[in-house]
Every structure is written in structure tokens, then in C-alpha cells.
Amino acid sequence: MQSTLPSLFIVGPMGAGKTTVGKLLAKHLGRDFIDSDHYICEQTGADIPWIFEKEGETGFREREARAIAELTALPNVVLATGGGVVMQPQNRDNLTKQGITIYLRANVDVQLKRTAKDKSRPLLNTPNPRAVLQSLFDVRDPLYREVADIVVETGDGYPRYMLKKIIEALKQHYPEHMKS
């Protein structure tokens, strides 16, 4: 598909499918795909749990803010962000000013199902991950909505179904940029 859209940024909670759907969207549009968490790991030579352990969440968020400033300035990319990206005002500013932001909205039940076996999520290494996910959702959902140009309810949908919903929304909201 041909498009003259600016860069596309995907936000949402952990387990929403940002990376999976982002890769599909990038392929569909013929664009490069970048995952900000993977980018941070490549830049530091360490994984996210290690960064959290050594630098704490504050250290990670500082690294994330630098990465988001750099990555949102790139042209014609699809960028999947980390779940906490919206916690920093400068990240929200970069997301809203540099491209089109798509919020993949997943409820806590969906997130819990998709993250249950994933041990690489430091914020879920707790006896009650449901409570953590609910707390994060309550704080972050309004911030995701604040930056979002498009909101896609993921439900229990498959990645290709979510891709279809995103493409339909892009055609509806930005028809001048979308050509079949």
C-alpha cells in the first residue's frame, strides 16, 4: 500500500501487541520498523530487566526519553514504544508533534493473558500482577488517550485483525495520505 503518512507511533500497555502489530503495519506500508525497547537494549548492550535492576525505573525512563526524542524524529518509520513511554511529558510532546500516534488499548484481562509467561517484564515480577496491571492501566490510559490520534480496541483480536482496524482508521482519518 502507498502512503504519504508521517511516521506512525504505537503506544499502549504491555501485552497490547505493539511490537507484533507494528511489524505487520510497517511491512504493509513498506516502512522500517523500530521497537524503542529493543533500540534501548541495543544502545546499552543490556536487557531491560538488567537496566531496571542497576539503574532503577528512573534510569530506564531517562534512557527511554533520549531514545524517543531520537526515534520520533526519523521519517517514514513505524515505532512501537514501551508501555511507560507516556509517563514522561517530553515523550508525550514528541509523540504528538512528530507523527501519528496509535493507541492499542487492551484491558487488564487481555494483558494478563498475553504476559502471563513472560519473565522479562520487571514491573510484573510481583505476587499480584493483576493489581499491578490495573494500577498501571488506571494511571496510563488517560495519558495514552491524550497522545492518541487513533484508538484501536484490541479485545482478544489477532494481530492481522488489529492491522485491518488500524488501516481502516488511517483511511478514515487520513484519506489524503492513503492510496490502495
UniProtKB/Swiss-Prot annotation:
Enzyme class (EC, first level): transferase
Binding, Mg(2+): T19
GO molecular-function term, one example from the UniProt record: shikimate kinase activity
Its EC number(s): 2.7.1.71
Pathway: Metabolic intermediate biosynthesis; chorismate biosynthesis; chorismate from D-erythrose 4-phosphate and phosphoenolpyruvate: step 5/7
GO cellular component, one term: cytosol
Entry binding sites for ATP: G15, A16, G17, K18, T19, T20, R121
Keyword Metal-binding set for record: yes
Quaternary assembly: Monomer.
Protein name as annotated: Shikimate kinase
Gene name as annotated: aroK
